[in-house]
Amino acid sequence: MKPTVACLAGFLMLVLLAGCKGSVDESGARENKGDIEASGTVSAAGREQNGKWNEEQKKALPEKLNVLYAANDGLYLIRVLRNGADDADDAAVSTERLAEGTDISSPLFSSDGRTAGYLRQDGFYGCSIETGKEELLLNGALSFVPDGKEGFYASSGETGIVRVHMGREQEEVWKPEPVDGGWIQCEKLTLSPDGKKLAFARRRYVDRRKDPGLSLFEQNQGIWMLQMNLEKEKKLSVLIQIIGEEPPFFERMEETDGEPYPYLWPAKWSPDSSRLFIWQDVLSGSMRADGIGTAVYDTVSGTMIDPLGEQEEVVLPYNENVVFGEGNSLFLLAGAGREMALDKELVKIPPEKGAVHEKLKTPGLVPQSPQVSYDGKSIFFAASKELETGEQVEYPIWRQLYRMENGHVAELTNDTEYSSEFPVLTGDGSVLVFGRVDKEGGMSIWSIGTNGSGLQKLADLEENISTDETNEHYPAGYEDFYGRGSWSSIMSVYAFK
C-alpha cells in the first residue's frame, strides 16, 4: 500500500464469521468468550453504544478525506469533511465527477493530493482536484507512480521513464538504448517512500513479423533501480541493476522443456526505503492462482533475501496481500496447498536473514489484504470463514473486516447483507476505507475508524453505472475469481490532517 497515498489495486471479498459461540453486545456484534488456541479470541471491536466518536477518537480522525474512484462513466471524487462532527452521520460527504468517459481506470492521487492521475485508452492523464482541468500527460503509458511531490513518474515504449506534471513539459529521467528490430520497456515503476529510489522491471520486445501489432516479448532484462540525486532533481546519481537479465524467451523454453519461467518485478518498498519486495511471477495461470515465489532486496547490503527461506510455500501474487510493518517486518499470505486463497495463512517475517517466521493465528478465519498500523501494534485484514472438512468453496466468497491486537482478533464489520473487503489504511492511521458488495452484486465504498467506530457509506458505485455504454476496465457486476474479486484499480485514498 504508503504514508499519504494508498492505491487500491484489486478489491477482495470478505466473509462473516459464522458459528461463533458467545454473546451479542449492544452494538450488534458478537464476542467469543472462550480462548481459541493460545493466540486469543474473536470478539466485536469496542464501539460506543450510541455510535458517536469520543473526544480521543475525534482527535485521531483526519479533518478531510478524499477518495477517487473510476466508474464506467467517468472519474469521481468523494470529499469527506468532518468539521468537528460528533459522528459519521454529521460529517459532510459530497461526490463529484471530475472527468467523463467510458475508458477511465487505475486512478491515484499525486503525493500532494492536488492532482488525480489515471489511464485512458490513449495514455496517462492528470486532472486538477481544484479546477477539474484535464490534461494528457503521456501517450501510451505503461506504468506510473506519484513522484513524491506534485507530479508523477511514468513510462512508455517511446519515451522510457519521464517525469510529468500538469502544465509543464515532460522531463526525461532515463531512456533505454535503441534495440535493432524492437524496443525496451520499463514496467512496474515503484518509488521508495523517501523519493530517492525508483525501481522498475526492464523487458525487451522484438517485432518478429515486421508488424508493430504482432510484436513479441523477447527477454526479461532484470530489475533496475535509479538512485535519484534530489539536489539536482533532473539528474541521476546511480543506475543499479538489482537482478541480472535472463536468457531470451525461446532459449529459456528449450532449457526448461516449456516449464514457466519466472518474470521478476518490483512491488513494494519498506517504510524506511531500505528494502524492496519482489515478485517471481509465472506465465501459468493455474500455478499463479495458487501462489508464486518472492524475494527481498536489501539496498544497504546490496544482497537478495528469500523471505520464506527453504519452506515450500508460495504467496498470493497480488500487492494487497503483502505489506511491510514497523522495523521492516514483512506480513504476507503464504501457504503450500493448491486451494488458492483458501489455504493461505497470515505470516510475519522478521527483517533478520534466517529469522524464524511467525504464523499469526486467526481462529476460524482465512485472512486477506493485511494492513499494519504505523506503530506496529494493530493488523487489519479482510477474512472469510474457514471451510469445514469436506466443505466445498462457493463463489463469491463472503468476507468481513477484522483487527488484531496482542493476539486478540476483533470484528470491525458484521453486516450479513454485505461482503466487506480490501481495507486501506489512511496515511494518518485512523481510518480504513474499503469496498462492499451486496447479495445482488451492487458495489459501494465505505469508511470506518480503526477502533470500529464511525462506519459510513461514502458512495454507491452502481448509481454511476451507465446502461448504454460500458467501461471495459470496469466490472459490470461483481465477480470473484479464484477467491479474489475483480475490482481492479478502482480506487485511491488521500487523508488530510
Regions found by a protein language model. Give the residues of each.
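Positively charged n-region of N-terminal signal peptides that target proteins for export
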Residues: 1-6, 10
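Short glycine- and basic-residue-enriched patches
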Residues: 13
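C-terminal motif of bacterial Sec signal peptides marking the signal peptidase cleavage site
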Residues: 16-19
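Sequence signature of WD/YWTD-type beta-propeller architectures
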Residues: 24-497
